[in-house]
Regions:
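C-terminal regulatory/oligomerization modules of transcriptional regulators
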Residues: 95-160
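Conserved segment of winged-helix/HTH DNA-binding domains
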Residues: 72-97, 109-119
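Key DNA-contact positions within bacterial/archaeal DNA-binding proteins
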Residues: 41
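Beta-hairpin "wing" of winged helix-turn-helix
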Residues: 53-69
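N-terminal helix-turn-helix DNA-binding core of bacterial DNA-binding proteins
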Residues: 2-6, 12-38, 57, 67
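Alpha-helical residues within the helix-turn-helix
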Residues: 34, 51-52
Length: 160
């Protein structure tokens, strides 16, 4: 089963919490912990990772806190997941930096694995943080061959 780690899930919740509020508002770790109903040490750890990965900005001072480094519509789900988990790859041979797989030379499905990885990555890159804070609707449509294809539509009507 492909599953995001718990900290990645919490990172998505945290980023969504920040994105829901006014862009000029700064958020303290304590306020975010309360808003997300997560332990303060967990939120502090998440903030450190997301800040280090360039998704958050830190503002010092008595009225300091954290804000998004970019507008929510410019931060993809893929970026957040990669910040928390590392490079997006379903298998070792899907890593862009090279494979650690012992079967690489004889693998019959390596090329297909890479294509599947690209499709999954593309789907995650198409969902933006701004989409996470609005309800998504699953829509079934037919392609040119008549096959049912599912897609999503945001509350604003943008198809993905």
């Amino acid at each position: 089963m492909i599953r995001l780690g718990k900290l990645t899930d919490y990172g998505l919740v945290l980023m969504s919490q920040i994105a829901k509020r006014d862009a000029s508002e700064l958020h303290t770790a304590r306020d975010l912990a309360a808003g997300c109903q997560l332990p303060l040490p967990t939120v502090s750890k998440l903030l450190k990772v997301l800040l280090h990965q360039g998704l958050l900005a830190s503002h010092r001072g008595t009225k300091g806190g954290y804000s998004l480094a970019r507008e929510p519509h410019l931060i993809s789900l893929a970026e957040i997941i990669a910040a928390m988990e590392g490079p997006l790859a379903l298998t070792e041979c899907s890593l862009e930096s090279g494979s650690l797989c012992d079967l690489e030379a004889s693998c019959a499905i390596r090329d297909n694995q890479r294509i599947i990885n690209q499709v999954v990555r593309g789907a995650l890159e198409s969902v933006m943080l701004s989409d996470l804070i609005r309800p998504l609707q699953l829509i079934a449509i037919r392609d040119a061959k008549g096959n049912v294809v599912t897609t999503t539509s945001t509350a604003s009507g943008r198809m993905q």
